[in-house]
Amino acid sequence: FDPYFTMDGVSRGYSVYFRETDYGEFNVANYLTNSFGAGIQFGYPINEIQRIGLNLNYDKTDISAGTLPAREISNFLNSEGDIFETLKAQAVWSRITLNRGLFPTNGSSIDVLFQTTVPGSDIDYYKINLRNKIYRPLGFADLVFGFVGELGYIGTYGDTEVTPFFENFYSGGPRSL
């Protein structure tokens, strides 16, 4: 299977999915989602280490809140409803200088992403992300210093007043300082 759409290294991909997730089972929050969607992705190489990507994805999500859901879940469902369809457009710029794709020991990977729902979607929001991974050898015992960081911002536009709680950014977790 050749992932490239043209001889110049332009890539094209497709995705189709269906997800049922009960977040109460994971003790995360008291709600469940059913969602399905499809998308198409294109990637274009700028040079040996840089690439841009353009993605378009359709998504339909149904959210069911359990008893006594968190305030952010209730606020979103009261404001925007519990079933909605979105068409998301995403642009990505990547710069990768890793010495290898799996288990790198030197180099960095930087991604800048801008995602927005297309006007006419049931909810209108946008996200900006910056992801960075840096690996440097420590010079003894084959040890490698690794740093992974992510910054993000989410906002709404149009008639949407509350950001989708399932798209929010969170700090902390088992792999955080």
Located regions from the model:
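Gram-negative/organellar outer-membrane beta-barrel architecture
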Residues: 1-100, 109
